[in-house]
Each structure stands twice: as structure tokens, then as C-alpha cells.
Amino acid sequence: MQSGHYNRRQSRRQRISSNTTDSPRHTHGTRYRSTNWYTHPPQILSNSETLVAVQELLNSEMDQDSSSDASDDFPGYALHHSTYNGSEQNTSTSRHENRIFKLTEREANEEININTDAIDDEGEAEEGEAEEDAIDDEGEAEEGEAEEDAIDDEGEAEEGEAEEDAIDDEGEAEEGEAEEGEAEEGEAEEDAIDDEGEAEEDAAEEDAIDDEGEAEEDYFSVSQVCSRDADEVYFTLDPEISYSTDLRIAKVMEPAVSKELNVSKRCVEPVTLTGSMLAHNGFDESWFAMRECTRREYITVQGLYDPIHLRYQFDTSRMTPPQILRTIPALPNMTLGELLLIFPIEFMAQPISIERILVEDVFLDRRASSKTHKYGPRWNSVYALPYNAGKMYVQHIPGFYDVSLRAVGQGTAIWHHMILSTAACAISNRISHGDGLGFLLDAAIRISANCIFLGRNDNFGVGDPCWLEDHLAGLPREAVPDVLQVTQLVLPNRGPTVAIMRGFFGALAYWPELRIAISEPSTSLVRYATGHMELAEWFLFSRTHSLKPQFTPTEREMLASFFTLYVTLGGGMLNWICRATAMYLAAPYHSRSAYIAVCESLPYYYIPVNSDLLCDLEVLLLGEVDLPTVCESYATIAHELTGYEAVRTAATNFMIEFADCYKESETDLMVSAYLGAVLLLQRVLGHANLLLLLLSGAALYGGCSIYIPRGILDAYNTLMLAASPLYAHQTLTSFWKDRDDAMQTLGIRPTTDVLPKEQDRIVQASPIEMNFRFVGLETIYPREQPIPSVDLAENLMQYRNEILGLDWKSVAMHLLRKY
């Protein structure tokens, strides 16, 4: 079966076959590290100077050559930073000069946006010079060919070749490569190639040669573009391949088929399931036939690498300090060497340039921005997002994605103050990304042990009132490693650093250093899901406050459904992490067949997160809803749906990546996907916690009737207990107190009044693309039997300490007034 994410196998073969340089071998996978390192002394700017520089650059337009109008034909640009050659000490400013690469029209149509890294200027032949001379092309462009033949003795320059090296004493012009789009492992080879006149077989065809026949200065047309991963490593993108992350539908038992086919109709006989592809069940063709998969999820490269019109004029060559890896408390009897043999994370702990951190911060902000928000780097900033101080009006505005710009700005500022800025202040310059990696690994082992301890394996039938509660599934006894066999719940590790990383509603996913450290494609997947969830939370914060915590009836019903789905999704991710951890820590004599649920990618192409329970709930809760109409009328629901779809897609692709890397023995990329899933799980838990607190406020403080499926609060409580080493649950009373304190600090006052028309500025939020499709419209759950539901306010009283907090008596008074 063809893997959908980045066409990984093909791109790796291309990187291996095309690499002819002497660059040192990278420590993991088949990739190669760039030979460039930032060695020149730093120029340290103050925070205010940095912010001013970034703001000016964000608002400025990109410089363009007066002879070309690239903005009419090419929507995206990639920023190229020239860097030092490690063997030279040249301090010429041309080595730090930013160059902008112009994308071809074909690549722009394929939505391939790139962020190219520095190209080495190999200037050994010309000491102190790194300037490239753009020579006008003489001749006609021969479409579709990349001419690499030697220039004849008369010195006639053929079209498509940029002469970059000096002409030798005999007067022969050495040939300069013009393979537009081919960047080999981060190095655009611009040296002279031999003039034997033989054209290489693997030359990339020039799809878009400049119509005017001019090689414009400061631009370099490419047809085989390059991108980079988190460790300054190039990998090549082929324009002939569609770079999209798909959950493809292939015919069962024919994994080599890449054509999208429908799975056969589900069985008509009743089926009793004991769980979703448990380790001891094995694969059964009839199990796949139970569902008709008609949905395809995707992440386009445009969603992963947004173009950034930004050029830093200040020195950003500083690096983060060297990272120190330590043993983890969850495995006290294991030395660091033994730990790294099992979990090879040393390549993730390398220093990261400040420039990469700033760019990654802006990437996430662009992902989370919409028409109602301006973007800019926020994690390392000290200023608050723009908002209107004064009264906060939270009434719903009907219309086509209509929202109040005042309320959205205020809600975003409150969210930023409560979550992002507080987490950034606690983490920046105090905690290194090496400590973050150690925390994720330690927490993953602890929550896996808790999952096994709390997993019941009682095999409740589908439709049983407890079927939602029993969504944590333990492992068979023979598949549980000794280190995961515990007799009591494993508590979180102690210390202020751990407390910081467990808090703030799972804010570690917003930490740019940590996202970069886990390396691609995990960096892009976390950014993709986190950006959509962040935008949804902005709109959620703009709809309520302590004086008016109610939502509209439609919003309450939909948010209750999304809360149920997020809890189920989190349980599925926790089950997968538990099995992956057990496979890592299992003794060599353990049969790998016990961990087939994480070593085979086939199930995940059919069912998201390999959870039939999640697929059933999607149909039962959202199948009868007119989603396009609801999303057009409620921008909050629209972005909540988009966020859920993004999380489901990213989580499934983590699991596919892990299984594919296992088959290819890519141990470094396996642990990258493993830690990426742990990081995303923390953000999922934080978002589910936030949804419950908002719904609980509407039920207890606002007196609204909200109904949730029976057993979902039990499942939520079990999930939070198991994941407590990774995420610290926020209680209802502490959340609303912190929110009121944040509003007071920002000068925002809650009010129940209606926004005056003279202050009412209605804008349209960014419409969403309705790509959401259901898997298996005929559910395994009996459709004629409705899901039993309970009142949220009544059910909350069973969790006075766990969910409501210590001040639950004051909350109970509101419940008594309601009845």
C-alpha cells in the first residue's frame, strides 16, 4: 500500500541516489546533515528592538526585481538564508545576504510551499567572494529539458544555464548547473561540472523556464524544490508527486494497490467486538468488511509549510545551549546508554538556531490566523495581542460566519494571557527542549503503565450502558513488559519543572523548540493540529464570561458532542501509546505478533486512530446534523469541527508513520512519531478539559440543560487518571477564577448588555472547507437503540473533587437554584 504522508519512501530513495557530495552522514535515517553551522559571533538585540524589527518586516512587502512582476504569477515564495561554510572564516556580508527563490507556476499550482535553508557558497576558488553573477540567457528555452552539455569552444551560452564560475585560462566556460528545482540534500551545487558533454540520466526536466529567457538576479527557478527537516537536513520534493497526507482506501489483501477503491459492504450478521484491533485479535478480512470507508482526510503541503513574507535583518545565528540528556525516573534501573539504545533521542537534543525557532513560531501563528486576527511571533514576544479594553459583549451574531470583531479580539487576548504567554514565561530560558524530550518520554512510560493497570478487558458488548466507560483496553498478560506491570496507579514525577510542563492546558505543543526537536514530519503534524485547535479556542473564549456563561442551544449540543469525541479520541491515542511503549520495552524473546496493532499500518488506512468506537460516535452524534448549515451560522462550531478533523488526521498519520518506519527499521523516525503522538495527546487532553469546563459553567453557573452520553464522564475521569503524569487536570472553580483574574488584568469587564450598534463591528470569519466525511454510515452500534444520555449538571456532582474542585459547595448552590 502506498503511504500517503510525503511519499516518504520515494523521497528517501531520491535523496540517497542524488547525493554525490562529501557531506557527513546524518546520525539517523538515510538523510544527511548540512555541512553548514552558524559560527560567526552573535549580535544580540534587546526585546524591544527585536519586536520592532519583526513587526516592520511582517508589514513590509518583499523586494522584487524591477524587470519582473513575480507577484502576478507566483503566490508563494521561499526564504533562503546563505550561511557560513564551516571551513572558511569569511565575514563578507554576502554570505549572510537573504535571497528569495522564485517558484515556478507548476509548483505554485501544486501548492508546494517551501522554506529552503542556506545554500553553501563554495568559494575556495575565489577567496572572499560568494556573489553569484546572473548572466542573461542567450537563445531560446527548450521546453521540458535541463541541458547540461558543455559549452562549445566559441563560448556560446545555451539557454537555461547560469554561468557562476570563472572561465579558465584556455577560454572554455565551465558549465554551471541550471537544474531548476533540484536541491540535493540542502546543497545547491553551483560548482563547475565536467565538460565531457554527457547529460546525466536523472536530470530534472525544466517545467517552467522564464518566458522572457532572462535569468533574473536574486531569483533561482526550481522545478524540484527543496525543504528541510528540524535538524537543518535537506530532503528533496519531486514536483511530479502529489505531496499530500492521505488516508487512502485500498483493496484488502492487496497492499501494493495504490488506486483508491471502496471496501466491500459490511457484514449483515451481528458482530461482537472485544475492542479495536487488540493485540491478541489479529487481522481478519471480515473485520475490515464491517465498514464502508468513503472518507479521505488529507493535509496539503500548503497547510504544513505556509509561505512567509519575512526577512530578518538582524543576526539570528545564535544557537540554543547544548542539551543534556538524563535518565528518566520512570526507569530508575536503566542507565542513560541503555535508554538511548531503546529510545534513540540523542539526535533530537542538538542545539537549534534562534532563527529556526523564530520562523517556526511564525509558522504556527500563520496556521492559527484567520481574517479576524493578525499574525506575528508570539511565543517569544512580550506584547499582548490587540484587543479592545472595556466591556465584553458575548451575544451570538447570526449570519454567514459573522462574528463580533470586538468579542473575538477580547477572547483571544484572554486565551493568550491565560495559556500561551504564561506558559512561555515559565518555560523560556528556564527549561531546555532536552528536558522537554525527557519529560515526554518519562510521561509516556508512566501513562502506559496506568493504561495497563486501568484497562479492564471485561469485553462489554456494543450498546451496553458501560460501553463508553470501558474504552481503555489493557494488554494481554503475556505482552506486558515487567517494567509496566504495576499494582497501583503511577503518580506524576515531582518537581517544579514537571509541574510547569504538565500545566497550561497542554501548552507544550506551542513551544517552538520542542516542535522542532521532534523533527519532521512530526513537527508539521503537531503544528497542523495545534493551529486549528488554537483557533477554535479563540472563538470559544469569545462566547462566554462569568456573568453570561451560556451558549446557544445549538452550540451547547454540538460542543457536548465534540467533548464526547475528544474523550474517545484521547482514549484511542492512549491505547496506541501503551502498545508502542510495551513494544519498545518488551524483552527480545517476546513475540512481535503481540504488538501487531502498532506494527501494521493497514488498519489505520480504513479507520481513523483504529477506533471503531470513535467512528460509531461520529455517525451517531453528527450524522443527522446539517453540518454545512450549522457551520455557516456558528463560526465557533465551524472551527471546532475543523480542529477535531485536524487532530484526528494528525493522530492517525502518527500511527501510520510509526508502522511504516518499523517495517523499514527507521528507529529514529519511529521514536519521532512516538513522541509526537505523546505531545499531541497532551494538547488533546487540554482541549477536552477546556470543553468540559465551558460546558460545566453553562450547566452549573448558567442553569442550562446539557445532555451527554451516559458513561462519558466516567471515561473522561479514567482518562485523566491514566494520563495524569502527562497532563494536570484543571478544575472548574480554578478555571473560572483564573479567567476572571485575566480579564481584570487586561481591563476587560464582563457584561450582560447587548453590544451597541455604534460599537458593533461585524466581520466574517474565515470560512472552512467541509472536508469532513464519516467512516461507515452503518454503525456497529444498533441504530434503533438510542444512546442513553444523562444531565451534565447531575452527573458532575459525582466528581466534586476531580472535576469541580475543592470549592464544590458553592457550585452546588447554583445547582439547587436551578431546580
Swiss-Prot record:
Main location as per UniProt: virion
Posttranslational modification: Phosphorylated by US3. This phosphorylation is required for proper nuclear localization.
> What segment(s) does the record annotate as region 6 X 16 AA approximate tandem repeats?
117-218
* Gene Ontology BP term (one): regulation of DNA-templated transcription
Please name the InterPro entries in this protein's record: Herpes_UL47 (IPR005029)
**A Pfam family reported for this protein in Swiss-Prot or TrEMBL:** Herpes_UL47
Q: Which UniProt keywords apply?
A: Host cytoplasm, Host nucleus, Late protein, Repeat, RNA-binding, Transcription, Transcription regulation, Virion, Virion tegument
Q: Where is the composition biased (Polar residues)?
A: 32-42, 82-93
Which residues belong to the signal peptide in this entry?
none
Region described as Disordered: spans on this chain: 1-42, 58-221
Molecular function via GO: RNA binding
Keyword Repeat belongs to the record: yes
Any domain commentary? The nuclear export signal is CRM1-dependent.
Q: What does this protein do?
A: Tegument protein that can bind to various RNA transcripts. Plays a role in the attenuation of selective viral and cellular mRNA degradation by modulating the activity of host shutoff RNase ORF17/VHS. Also plays a role in the primary envelopment of virions in the perinuclear space, probably by interacting with two nuclear egress proteins ORF24 and ORF27.
Additional note from the record? Expressed in late in the infection.
Protein's recorded name: Tegument protein UL47 homolog
Organism of provenance = Varicella-zoster virus (strain Dumas)
